[in-house]
Amino acid sequence: MRYRLLGQTGLYVSELCLGTMTFGGATGIWESIGNLQQDAVNEQVKFAVDAGINFIDTANVYSMGKSEMLLGQALISLGLAREQLIVATKATGSMDESPNGRGQSRHHLYNQVDASLKRLQLDYIDLYQIHGFDPLTPFEESLAALNDLVRSGRVRYIGLCNLAAWQIMKALAVSERLNLAKFVSVQAYYTIASRDLEREVVRVIQDQKLGLMVWSPLAGGLLSGKFNSADDKGPAGARRGAFDFPLVDKMRAFKCVDAMRPMAERRKISVAQIALAWILSKSFVTTVIIGAKSMDQLRDNIASSRVQLDEAEIKLLDEVSQLPPEYPGWMLAYQGQARAKPPYKE
């Protein structure tokens, strides 16, 4: 297992992060995503940590708090050293039907960090993330609250998820102007079949030296190699069959799978491992979040950390999955040619 620095911090996190969305199986969409209970959760956490993973990501809304509870109990039952683990969770989503049961107000963030700490049975959260954009709460309020949580010791670092490039830059500017704790990481959807992140957000991540945590790297299982057509529901119990998320161009995805399959067959490994290895080959990626419904899935995903694609394979996959030109990107590239090389005169 390799480790990478999280943004501009001095904190090393494993290049694979254990996702916990499959823990709990509450009603609704959560049951279709995963229904792992305590014994299975303990087994997954132990296997991941033994494999070198030191980074675990959860959220208050996952199975409406049950994911955090199961994870917290696993850490205690397994007797894991707290200082050796980086635990991340999130807040923003709706936790109840009260007027202030969602969002990023000081009121909600304070209540939710305390609730998460209680469920996790922890004294502090390593990385506390806003789980999206709240159009009603000014960044000034949210960041001041998060800054206070950092100063109190309940939170050590702060991150964000699923924001547009302009929103990320605005948040960083507010922190700079008011001398508040800054977001150190971005959690975002990125796969070989869905590279939209590269248009704007990746540029911000690189320019501002933020960490990138990739969620749903297999597009909800679509890139596992177990689906054969856009209408295919996959094997029994497949998440895509019941919960068709996240959004992906399925024809584009199958084109990528067709390119990855020979690489997997030559190595006698799964297509999923090739898809994960491609993401890990990108220098702007800090960690890839892997969530599994079974131990077989977890073992297979973790094995991707040992897969090294060669330059020719990466080039082929980059070309197959290349984004179509879009303005202003193509204009910037065209105009940039004039500054690509230093001037020279015989």
Locations of the language-model features?
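Active-site-proximal loop/turn and secondary-structure-junction residues that shape catalytic pockets
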Residues: T22, N60-Y62, A91-G93, Q129-D134, ...
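Generic structural signal for well-ordered alpha-helices
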Residues: V45, E68, G72-L75, V113-L117, ...
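Glycine/proline-rich, positively charged
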Residues: T27, D96-D196, E200
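Terminal-tail/helix-coil boundary detector
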Residues: M1, D207, D231, P235-P262, ...
